[in-house]
């Protein structure tokens, strides 16, 4: 494949993104089947219906934030794919702290809304589900962001075009 870093031609972007987006769309359909299979669980615990969609979106958002930062650093020439890259670790720490804060707040918000619209789950249970699964999703988003940026770079693709769709779609599936 030709090196698309530094090029902004529509043809190059479409040629890169079209097959990727088709594959990711097919994978997204699979996640819909998983959600459908869990329908009974969600109907038994309506508060989860409040929690799950937001968690799915938030995992992708966290991955998109890190992917954007990594892509910018790559274009500026300051990104090192090294375990000693202090800026990379600072970005990862920021994402993890943001995840803990957001998923904790999400658990409380789901509990409050659950009290209004349905029979709520216990706050402790919601916090364990929200923060626990949210942090696992955040770790996966971090790993996916770094891997997608690295693979894009090694393949000569512009990570601005590839990383965010890959990370957000995979986080949607894993969420």
What is each residue range found by the language model?
Residues 1-40, 111-128:
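Helix-loop-helix hairpins and the membrane-proximal interhelical loops
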Residues 2-10, 46, 50, 80-92, ...:
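Juxtamembrane loop-helix boundary motifs flanking transmembrane segments in multi-pass membrane proteins
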Residues 13-101, 134, 169:
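Hydrophobic, small-residue-rich transmembrane alpha-helices and their short perimembrane loops
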Residues 25, 126-146, 159-175:
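Hydrophobic alpha-helical transmembrane segments that form the multi-pass transporter/flippase core
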Residues 26-35, 39, 105-113, 117, ...:
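Alpha-helical membrane-inserting segments
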Residues 59, 155-157, 171:
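Single, functionally critical "micro-switch" positions that shape active/binding sites
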Residues 65-83, 144-164:
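Juxtamembrane helix-loop transition segments at the membrane interface in multi-pass membrane proteins
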Residues 94-113, 123:
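Short alpha-helical transmembrane segments in multi-pass integral membrane proteins
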């Amino acid at each position: 494949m030709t090196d698309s870093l530094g090029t902004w031609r529509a043809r190059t972007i479409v040629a890169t993104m079209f097959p990727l987006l088709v594959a990711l769309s097919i994978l997204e359909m699979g996640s819909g089947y998983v959600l459908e299979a869990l329908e009974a669980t969600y109907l038994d615990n309506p508060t989860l219906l409040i929690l799950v969609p937001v968690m799915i979106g938030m995992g992708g958002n966290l991955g998109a934030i890190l992917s954007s930062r990594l892509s910018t650093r790559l274009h500026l020439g300051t990104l090192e794919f090294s375990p000693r890259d202090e800026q990379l670790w600072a970005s990862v720490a920021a994402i993890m702290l943001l995840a803990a804060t957001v998923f904790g707040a999400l658990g409380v918000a789901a509990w409050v809304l659950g009290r209004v619209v349905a029979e709520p789950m216990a706050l402790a249970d919601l916090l364990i589900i929200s923060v626990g699964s949210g942090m696992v999703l955040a770790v996966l988003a971090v790993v996916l962001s770094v891997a997608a940026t690295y693979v894009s770079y090694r393949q000569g693709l512009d990570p601005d075009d590839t990383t965010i769709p890959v990370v957000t779609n995979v986080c949607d599936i894993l969420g």
